[in-house]
Amino acid sequence: MTAIYLMSVLFGLACGQAMSFCFPTEYMMHVERKECAYCLTINTTICAGYCMTRDINGKLFLPKYALSQDVCTYRDFLYKTVEIPGCPHHVTPYFSYPVAVSCKCGKCNTDYSDCIHEAIKTNDCTKPQKSDVVGVSI
């Protein structure tokens, strides 16, 4: 019994190192505009996880494109649009956000992703919250 358990643990570790774990993950964000009365809580999905990558030792002799590493990024996504409540008539109350449908390990595409690693910004509301949002697909 112990040998079977040990082999299954080793197999799991080997597969875990060989496979990437990049998939849509639930994410809650808060959206507010200074002109509007409320903060909106939105539940969406983002791509999260890790991808297998290797750091090459001979960096001086390789072109820059060979030095890029794979990141967990969107394969398929769609945008949803919500209306922020309590906005005056002169302010556009609509906010669009991406929803991850599927993810992949690949190069970061700056057309639709923020590829710069920055310090985590707070994701808080400073105004009264509204939740249970129904998004409108565009």
From Swiss-Prot:
Signal peptide start and end residues: 1-20
Disulfide bonds: 22-72, 36-87, 39-125, 47-103, 51-105, 108-115
InterPro entries: Cystine-knot_cytokine, Glyco_hormone_CN, Gonadotropin_bsu, Gonadotropin_bsu_CS
Gene3D superfamilies: Cystine-knot cytokines (2.10.90.10)
Residue ranges listed under propeptide: 133-138
UniProt name for this protein: Thyrotropin subunit beta
Gene behind this protein: TSHB
Pfam family, any one: Cys_knot
Main location: secreted
Compartment(s) where it occurs, according to its Swiss-Prot or TrEMBL record: Secreted
GO MF annotations in UniProt: hormone activity
Family named by the database record: Belongs to the glycoprotein hormones subunit beta family.
Keywords: Disulfide bond, Glycoprotein, Hormone, Secreted, Signal
Glycan-modified residues: 43
Subunit structure: Heterodimer of a common alpha chain and a unique beta chain which confers biological specificity to thyrotropin, lutropin, follitropin and gonadotropin.
Record-level GO cellular component terms: cytoplasm; extracellular space
Function: Indispensable for the control of thyroid structure and metabolism.
A biological-process GO annotation: G protein-coupled receptor signaling pathway
